[in-house]
């Protein structure tokens, strides 16, 4: 009897010891001591008790290639283990080998068709490969099984967004899918952010505000949702709210190009030019090697023209012009901006300003530029050219704008129009010339 008891104890001891070791390894991993199981567990093919622990520890230490070998050794023992297939898929995803991850999750999904995690990871991996048609089909297959799945509609929206890169009309289907996902789960941050982005892209800014504000009642920390919320306020020209939201994003650690750019635009809209200049300069530094952003340069130049950086403002606007394709509408916009920058830069070369204004007139046909040109010539005491451009300006002013008139069309007492100023300047120049040279 004693002999049998001793033999039973001897057989039971290894099992007890293994259980103790497993618990010890798990405790070490719970304490983030991944090196301990990696060092102590000797890789042995088919050791199903310890191999998963070592594989998970290797993955946690970003030693994915070694972890792959461990999971693969287990798969050789049992190719129908869905859990091992999923772990193998996760390793492949971590290594950005998404094609292999798709294969692993597809096999796991065949073994457990109702497993939502396997289905989600299969779709995520498919989307990461850029195979949007297959992703769309997989999402539709999911929704055939579960038409109420918010996640299924969300992935369908992502698939259609990918297809829209080649066929823009697919964006409508993306919107429909995200809208369906939102109706089923209005608190999914990714869905809300994507739906709001589509609203913003379609200039439906109030709708973007609505969906993001509802989400923010339960979570104010989601970066993607807050970005779309802030952008919507900025595009609606609610610049104060835009500044508030973008500053909150910066406080959360978001100092991306987009956040700094739109924060600068919002400050510019509030006429806080120093803050606009500061944030737009920060945004520009984030793109040193990329092609310059013309819109960024335009607003940066305009902001600088209102601070002590007028010279830099002129340079930024010139850079924007040099980078722009010569389409009339864009060039008019930029040359108007350059004229404004030069007008505020009092130390700038007056003849450079004159050439810029002449170029601007050739694009926008704003005859008031002739008055500004005349003023510059007058300051340089180039009276012949000054008179020429004053007269050129006066010849183009409509009769109803030659005098300062009120709403009823009557002359305004104490007000002088630019036309009258030009008329007076010509008279003063000629009188001065007469007294100095005897020439009228």
Predicted features, each with a name:
Residues 395-440:
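Terminal, low-structured helical/coil segments at or just beyond the last alpha-helical repeat
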Residues 30, 60, 94-95, 128-129, ...:
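Register position in tetratricopeptide repeats
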Residues 53, 87, 117-124, 155, ...:
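Canonical tetratricopeptide repeat
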